[in-house]
Structure formats: structure tokens, C-alpha cells
Amino acid sequence: MRLDVEQTSKLDRVRADYNVHYWSQGFYGIDDQGEMYVSPRSDNAHQIQLSKIVKQLEERQLNVPVLVRFPQILHQRVHSICDAFNQAIEEYQYPNKYLLVYPIKVNQQREVVDEILASQAQLETKQLGLEAGSKPELLAVLAMAQHASSVIVCNGYKDREYIRLALIGEKLGHKVFIVLEKMSELDLVLREAKSLGVTPRLGIRIRLASQGAGKWQASGGEKSKFGLSASQVLNVISRLKKENQLDTLQLVHFHLGSQMANIRDVRNGVNESARFYCELRTLGANITYFDVGGGLAIDYDGTRSQSSNSMNYGLVEYARNIVNTVGDVCKDYKQPMPVIISESGRSLTAHHAVLISNVIGTETYKPETVTEPEEDFPLLLNNMWRSWLNLHNGTDARALIEIYNDTQSDLAEVHSQFATGVLTLEHRAWAEQTSLRIYYELNRLMSTKNRFHRPILDELSERLADKFFVNFSLFQSLPDSWGIDQVFPVLPLSGLQNAADRRAVMLDITCDSDGAIDAYVDGQGIESTLPVPAWNEDEPYLMGFFLVGAYQEILGDMHNLFGDTHSVVVNVGDQGEINIDFINEGDTVEDMMRYVHIDVDQIRKNYHSLVSQRVDQEEQQQILAELEQGLSGYTYLEDF
């Protein structure tokens, strides 16, 4: 019984260290066996260990890395966002409705878009629409929007073809809002609408003075790429009046930027845009839709803060701030309250997907015995030896800092003297091994309670951390981690009761030094290393990369010709059964070669030619078979 209590207490500390409760929104957790689980059902029934899903996939000959999608989580996110706005509307007694418009750029995968639309299939009144930002996306949503509310919002730069396609959408029975991003688009829309005999539905994107903070702050503000200034907005009104087309302007749109961490920035932007809406109404524009764009954030690190990886508000608070602000401004102006639209793609999709892969090897520092330098070793190395003796024989906290600084200085000098030929390779090897042992002991003896020790401990933690080589490409599967330093929760899937054993950093298998994760969720902050159970080469060691359902797979690139991973759709049944409903196999080597226009048929001919010329006849078939197997195989590592 006592062991059970101790185990539970230990796991509670581990759960706190990984901050799982806060970033997971209840969809993921650590069970009492130290296993990561998923709980995707709306009734919260059944906690399914992720490692069991991997075992079922292996039985189907599907190896990691694999992206696992949970459509039940997508359904829950749709309902949660809509419910938050519906609650805010009811509380405020707001006399209009809310629409959740999904911008498919966030994740255009068919399995994702179909499930989002299916989430409201049984509802008589649907609160879903779709957004397109390009011609290809528009052509996709024109065939899908009838499964939602038939509302389509068209953003992005537009040419004649784009505009004609949007207008054709009206003929297909959709409500297509063509959002003007620049003045020249207005002439195109009016001309093509007349040509097709269609009354257009126009929207106008406002370039606000308000600007958020964070990685995407350039999306808002007066220098933003998109949107019309106040004077340009008035020019649009004047032109529409002149053409007797003012009633075609039906929507006001703004976008402060993705991942808005501070609710005050959201409120300020909504307030400014709501005043644009009311001013345009007073000028005679019959605008009835108010589109707040994206920005609803994800709490990637679980700190509920204003950091760019977090958010200092919840769903209900977000909805209340928008509804209340729009309502209050409309009351001030005595204008009708519009339909509210949000384009909350990141919040909708991020939680539903997990990338799972395996650790294929590690590099671990193991303390070695420090040997006394030989008599002919230089004075510099003897200085390092004295530092080790002082540390080994015991010293006070202040001296620990001095030993650290001396060792840093001595090691730098060793590298300098080796580069100029003063020291030998043997000298350098001794110095590096001795310094590592000194660092190891300093890390053990220093305390986080001493504020002067803390920055040194951070440095030592990085220096001594295990290197975990994980079978994935950061550039393909987590491009935002590399490109904009986005933090994603990363956890081992098993053995978490021993998570404090080691600290590690995750490295991918690309031939690029940037292929490393530099920041990890750890308690109430971000650390440069991750607490992990020790690696055992005799047992599979699985890592999970969470909250990767938004943007990552569509932004991923083909560095080193690593392609898309396998992806699967998993639903959890009423009895807790794991239903693998769809498997999309990842790219083969041949797929990737063809993508970069390598003639694979010629490759095969070259193989045959080389084999026939260079390989003994009895080996030729075997060699050709292995080469062919390589072409048809997964781009990731499989054979261990």
C-alpha cells in the first residue's frame, strides 16, 4: 500500500514537471502505470495508452514515425469553441449568432477537413463555414461547404480567375464573401460579377492601428501586409455608392495575427474594428457580418501566461471579450449587432494530432575516473588537476563557482593551444575528459536554491544532457520548432515513473545541426533539456510530439528527402476498443525522388548497368533486390 502511495506521489510530480494537465486540455495524460494516454471521447470514457496504438500499427506492418489523428478531439474542439460563443451570446443577450469558419490553410488534409465538417452533420442549424486563401483552396472548399453552413470566406490576393471562381460559388448555392485586401480587387469583382450575372457579397479587410505581440505581430498594425487603410475604406464606400452597389458590402474583417497570447490585445483589436463596422453602417453600408479572423491561441507550454507559447485566457473568456466588446460598441452607436465570425483554425486542430517516433540511439556521459596528469604535462593541465582535487576534497558553495569559471577558462585555453600546435591530441583528450568530470560533480553539488548557481546549473544541464537521436525530421514534422522557435510538448510514452532519471535533448536524423529541439515544456516554464527515463537499448523507446495538428504537416519540407510520415486515423469505441479507421502510408524513397524530378526509371537502368559491370553474377540478383527495396521503402529508418 505504501509503495502505491509513493508511486502515485511520484507520478503526480512527474505530471507537474511535464505540465500535462494544462497544455493537454484533458485529451492527454499520464496514467498510474507511467504511460502516456489519450482520452478523445466527449464522455471522457477510456484512457488509451499511446504505446498500445503503436503496437496495433506494428501488427499491421506500419512502423514509426507515424502521425496519429484523433477525429473525436476535432469534434470536441468544434463544439467547445461554438459552445463558448453561444454561452457568451446568451449571457450578454446578444441578438445574433456566431459562426466558426475553418481556414483550411491550417491543415488541408482531407481527413481533417472532413471530420471538422462531420462534427455538426447531425445538427439542424450549423455553425461552421470554410475559409480559402488561394485558388487551390477555393476550388477545394467549393466542393465541401454544402456540408456546413455554406458560408465561404475568400481571403488572400486575387486575380480574375480566383474572383470568377468565388462568384461561381454563389451560383452553386454558397454564401461566398470576397474579402477585399487591396483596392484593385474591387474593379475586378464588379466587372466579373456583371459578366456572370451574379450579385457579389463583399467583405473588407481593415488595416488596424491595434497590434498584438508575439511571433505573428506583423499580421496586424499599420504596416501589415494585408488590409485597407481608413482612407481606402472610404474610397471603397464612395465607389460602391457610385455603382449603386453599396448593399453588396456585407462583412468587415480584421486579423491581428495567429497565437494572440494576451486577451487585452484581442479586446483592443475587436474594439477598433467594431467602430469601423459601426462607422460604415452610419455611411449606409448594410454590413451584417463581423469577422474577427484568427488569433485564438493554444497554451503550448501550459503556463497560462502572455508568452508567445501560451495564452492568458480561456475559451469562454475569449468569446465573452469579443461578444461583449462588439455588443457594447454597437450599443454606443445604436447600430444592430452583427453575426460574429472567428477563423480559429489553430485552436480547432492543434490538439488532435500526435507524432510518435522511436529513439534509435543515445549519446550519454558516464563519469570516468580522473587520472593524475603525467609529469611532462603542461602547467595548464596541472591547473585543471588542482581544480579537480579541490572539488573532490570538498569545498564551499562560493568556491564551486570559482572552480567552474577556472575550468571554463582552462578548457578554452587548451583548445586554443591545441589549434596552434602547443598541445597534443593526448593533452586535449585528457583536458576534455577531466573538465566533463568536474562539470558532472559541480552539477551534483550546486543547488538551485542558490541564485548564483542557477545560471551555471542551466549551462551544466545542457552540457551533460543525454543526446537522444529520434527517427524523424524536424524540418518535415515540426517546422515551426526550427523556423520560429515554437515550443511543442515532447514526452516519452512509457516509463514516466522514472522520468527524473536523466535529462536529454532530442535530435533528428537529418544531416543538419539545426535538426534539434532547443526548448522543452518543464513545469511552469521552458527549459533547454527534458527530464526522461534512462534509455535501454534492449527495449523500444517511444517519444510523443504533441499539439502538432495545426500547420506542421502542411509547412513541412523535404530536407534530406525525408518525406511525409505515415498517418493514421484512430477512434476509440464505446468499449474502449482502438479502431484504426484509415491508414495513409508515408512517402517512399521513389516518391521523394520523383518529387524533385529525378528520373527513377533511369536510376533503375543505371543500377542494372553498374551491377552487371561490377558485381559477380551470383550476387547480382541480391544486390538489385536490395536496391529496389530501398527505392520502394520508407524514407525513415526501419532496420535496426
Swiss-Prot record:
It is an enzyme of class 4 (lyase). GO terms for molecular function: arginine decarboxylase activity; metal ion binding. SUPFAM superfamilies: PLP-binding barrel (SSF51419). Its EC number is 4.1.1.19. InterPro entries: Ala_racemase/Decarboxylase_C, Arg_decarb_HB, Arg_decarbox_C, Arg_decrbxlase, De-COase2_N, Orn/DAP/Arg_de-COase, PLP-binding_barrel. GO terms for biological process: arginine catabolic process; putrescine biosynthetic process from arginine; spermidine biosynthetic process. It comes from the Bacteria. Substrate binds at residues 290-300. The keyword Metal-binding applies. Gene3D superfamilies: 1.10.287.3440, 1.20.58.930, Alanine racemase, Lyase, Ornithine Decarboxylase, Chain A, domain 1. It catalyses: L-arginine + H(+) = agmatine + CO2. Keywords: Decarboxylase, Lyase, Magnesium, Metal-binding, Polyamine biosynthesis, Pyridoxal phosphate, Spermidine biosynthesis. The modification N6-(pyridoxal phosphate)lysine is found at residue 105. Its cofactor is Mg(2+); pyridoxal 5'-phosphate. Disulfide bonds: none annotated. Catalyzes the biosynthesis of agmatine from arginine. Belongs to the Orn/Lys/Arg decarboxylase class-II family. SpeA subfamily. This is Biosynthetic arginine decarboxylase. It comes from Vibrio vulnificus (strain YJ016).
